[in-house]
Amino acid sequence: MTFGTAGRLPPAPNPGAPAAATWQRDDWLTLADRMLAAARPFASPGHALVTFPGPEGGYGRAVDGLEGFARTFLLAGFRIAGAQGMGVDELVDRYAAGIAAGTDPSSPDRWVRLGEHPQAKVEAASIALVLDLTRPWIWDRLPSAVRERVVDYLRPAVGDDTYPRINWVWFRLVVQTFLRSVGGPHSLDEMNEDLTTHDGFVRGDGWMSDGPDRAYDHYVGWALHLYPTLWARMAGAADLAEQRRERDLAGLDRFLSDAVALVGADGSPLIQGRSLTYRFAAAAPFWVGAIAGVPSVSLGRLRGAATRIVRHFVANGALDKRGLLTLGWHGPWPRLAQSYSGPGSPYWASKGLLGIALPADHPVWTIPEEPLPVEERDTLRAIPAPGWLVSGTRADGIVRVVNHGTDHAVEGATVSDSPLYARLGYSTATTPVLDDSGWASPLDQSVTLVDEAGRVTHRAGMRLLTVHVDTDGVGVAGSRALAHWVDPDPGQRDHGGGRAGRSRPAGHLTVYSLVRGPWELRLTRVDGLADGVEAAALRLRIGGWAVAGDATATAGGGVAVVAGADLTSRLESVHGGGTAGVTAVPHGGPLAGGLVVPWLDHPVRPGAWVATFTELSRTPVATAGRACQAVVDEDGRGLHLAVDWPDGISTSTRLDAEHARPTQVSW
């Protein structure tokens, strides 16, 4: 694999402030060297296993050690390749020794084999990728007996049809591509099958879903766009890659136009989706764009996005005093882990340092960094594939996503809501509630029905109705859900999605969002209730943004406000009525401190629209009585909404009858 050319850590920014300082290549190398040096004491005597401290992962210590080796090998490989093998002898020797020991079945350091545990298939792909990337300095210098053992270790990937049909198809493909390049066993039929499966993930505008579910998350960037670009440069991929290079480049280019608008001015990625403990792996797609040479996003902006993301985590304590990554977001927060996570899992973050594989004279290092879109102006865009409205505000640097199409499920599913996917809103400044209550009883950024026993409905399986930006500069999105109660089956493994179980319908809910800047006007209607479900026994609950840290809260008169040190969440009934409240969740998410969530309860009146105003801002504009004024008229053509926003701007929005009409309730 080759990429052609075309010390110190700078001061960190204040939280929420635009990250104006830049990093030079030496700063990136200093960080990489620091991380690699910190990992070294946790290597086994033969260097084949890197077992970081902490509780044993969900798959056992042997897998933990392999994962620690493979994921730090990614970082070491980028470092070696970028240095062209010069001045990195210790890294070359350390990881070459680990490969020799790990592939030796008689070694106490031996790796878990691909047939012994599925996780070995994931880590084998990283090993194969880096062996290709560093071929002149590691592979070509390995003794022939060790090379034969490597081939033997990777061989089980050929003919194995148990790889899940998600991003894992790239693990089989990368391994077989490397084997092909060294004269090892491989199957062109299987390689083409994996490429075809990947193409089936494509949903439009450069977006892909990680499998058949509506699983839109950071894997789009750090896996589904990263692997095609790196794979195409592997020695064994040339003929297969050539026929798809232009198409893959176009998809990456289009995706990155959206991706740069999803990063907050402080460098925080969106706190949404599974595997968040991989942290600054979210920077990887921007380096991929630089490697591929995308035409629409400049190298300066790509590098600037990557810098802001990685620096955000460095500045906020992602590396502990030993220089190690732990399970968490900023600092440690073990509950962020999925069932597949172990102490070495966070080192998938190594992908965020992919740029150091590019040589010092690559243009990405020689031109100035450029600001993010949200640092230059307010932004508003609709992304149809995930059903997202994206609103970034320059005044406070926050990027918000209003979500009507992503749930890690399929339309019509009746699983529970995953708080990582199915909430109505995510942002770069907030976390969803992720404790047990967040999985069992959706509250933050949710619209639910609550029965007399306090049981809360879920909306997963909803139908996306529309997502667009209209001519008034208002983002419009809507969805319709069969609200349902779920009793989850016991013993399920956490892979980030909702829980399966016995479900019972409550009724159909339609929700529309009108979005401008930090504000959302949320329209909600109960279209009808299921047989045996009585309106009098229910409450319609509307939840707002959760605020982390020391927060003060007020609730009353149809208004709930939560104010933290530098963030305010406001929820207000537009037409009056409703009971306002707040709920504190002491250990609800990975940001510092507990969470406080504002909410409004309304009586259930099927067929009637309920209008709610929400605001999330570091510089709040709305005040009591001046939050938002809206007139909602319904006629045979649909809904017409005349809205006076807190900044004095008036807009007019129409929702057509096909979107706005009540559902025909059937169960």
Task: Report each predicted region and the residues it spans.
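Extended repeat-based interaction scaffolds and adjacent low-complexity, acidic/S/T/P-biased segments
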Residues: 433, 438-667
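Composition- and surface-driven signal marking solvent-exposed, interaction-prone regions
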Residues: 243, 274, 298-305, 362-369, ...
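Structural signal for hydrophobic packing residues in well-ordered secondary-structure cores
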Residues: 43, 76, 103, 135, ...
